[in-house]
Amino acid sequence: MRVGITGVSGLIGSALADDLRADGHQVVGISRHEVAGGLAWDIEAGKLDPAALEGIDAIVHLAGESIQGRWTAAKKQRILRSRVDSTNLLASTIASLDQPPRVVVSGSAMGYYGDRGDEVLTESAAAGTGFLADVTRAWEEAAAPIADHRVRLCTARTSIVLATEGGALPRMRTITRVGLGGALGSGRQFWSWITLDDEVAALRFLIDNEVEGPVNIATSNAVRQREFAKRLGAALGRPAIVPAPGVAIRTALGEMGRALLLDSTRLEPRVLLEAGFAFESPDLGAAFGLLLDT
């Protein structure tokens, strides 16, 4: 199977590429700079060679500006445009193909739902409000035309991905190891999560199985943030009792801190579960034990 991956150098993209190659599949990395076995695209100029995608079996679209860092007006534009413009380019290129891929898994995120308190959010839940909700809604809308061209389309609403190689966990581990872990704000906000291995397995499941539409990529065991901190502390043998007031987080990190740390998003992966997907690491404490070798 030939699989195209945008964002192939990122945490999820690189892990997915390695996993596919290990099983003998051909990976075509789609990036700004052409690499061996891949191809380059110019999103700003709207250039992607259609011939290079002819006959490809699947595309996993993960490209986008990192949401980490202070959200200045310029940063927010890059977050939005990198996702929407790249997806528009991919959709228009697929529309021109004689042999389009049979499936496209297009990136999205749990930010689609916004800050929802204790509400259990399945894929049928309405979009929320706020910057990330606006971005992910526009991102998914840009991908929608792909389904008009004999292509099965999934939108992967990914949660917090736990990995030792990158993402949020290394920073949280460092903070906890020096004794500064604890509740952020009230600590009552739900954090939805998945390990990197399960994330990769879920994306491959979407490629291989007849699933379409939005898909929550998270375990069904979302936990309150204070419980997340407690379990991380237990895995590291450190207390997690130092709170960070919400006002301090908002002052220090601005809108980004509120959205990523204080918003509550309690995902239920109903589509994955009903399709028969099995998580290897559904328990947070056990996942920390595996990831942190404790």
Segments predicted by a language model, with ranges:
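Glycine/proline-rich active-site loop of Rossmann-fold NAD(P)-dependent oxidoreductases
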Residues: 137, 149, 162-171, 205-215
